[in-house]
């Protein structure tokens, strides 16, 4: 078992590829269709994360669909209509599933507690590890991100530990500002606008 939510997403995609599924257009509800005459701005929010993408993720420990900006384009958003691509990343990493992901340091249990890291669908505790900077940069490049928000800074600030991986090397910082500076400098070549959020409010 891969540790998915077991809510039936993969069987739905299997039906689609086998051409036996029900298309959304067949059960159209006009009341919920965006009125083209409004010409408003649309913010598309993707679920899950880059490394769960069916093509770019850690296969087979992936979801059944596309978690990249390509998923929006595949579903009818014209590429030229996209003005900004926002990336949202935790300043540490989490994962729910059957593969071994969490490090052996007991501090990860503390991060899980402070960050309330439990699966949104199943309530399972998320495995926690330090930010993989190489993977982050890959996600930025593949998606063409031009605006990047790091959240959960408040969690690391509360436990007073700021670490990340760059390749096989772990970098340990003495304060939050040092970690933020390092990340900002290392991402200069991507020309991405970066915001570090320590907002504790629930969304």
What are these regions (language model features)?
Residues 1-203:
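Non-transmembrane, aqueous-exposed alpha-helical and coiled segments at domain scale
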């Amino acid at each position: 078992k891969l540790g998915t939510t077991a809510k039936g997403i993969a069987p739905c995609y299997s039906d689609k590829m086998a051409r036996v599924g029900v298309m959304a257009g067949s059960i159209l509800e006009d009341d919920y269709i965006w009125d083209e005459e409004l010409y408003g701005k649309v913010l598309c929010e993707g679920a899950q994360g880059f490394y769960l993408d069916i093509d770019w993720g850690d296969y087979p420990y992936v979801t059944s669909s596309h978690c990249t900006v390509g998923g929006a384009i595949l579903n009818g958003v014209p590429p030229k209509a996209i003005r900004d691509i926002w990336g949202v990343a935790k300043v540490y990493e989490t994962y729910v599933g059957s593969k071994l992901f969490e490090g052996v340091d007991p501090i990860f249990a503390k991060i899980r507690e402070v960050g309330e890291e439990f699966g949104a669908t199943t309530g399972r505790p998320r495995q926690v590890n330090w930010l993989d900077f190489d993977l982050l940069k890959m996600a930025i490049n593949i998606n063409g991100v031009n605006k990047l928000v790091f959240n959960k800074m408040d969690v690391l600030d509360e436990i007073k530990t700021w670490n990340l991986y760059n390749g096989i090397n772990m970098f340990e910082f003495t304060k939050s500002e040092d970690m933020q500076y390092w990340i900002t400098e290392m991402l200069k070549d991507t020309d991405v606008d970066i915001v570090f959020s320590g907002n504790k409010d629930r969304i």
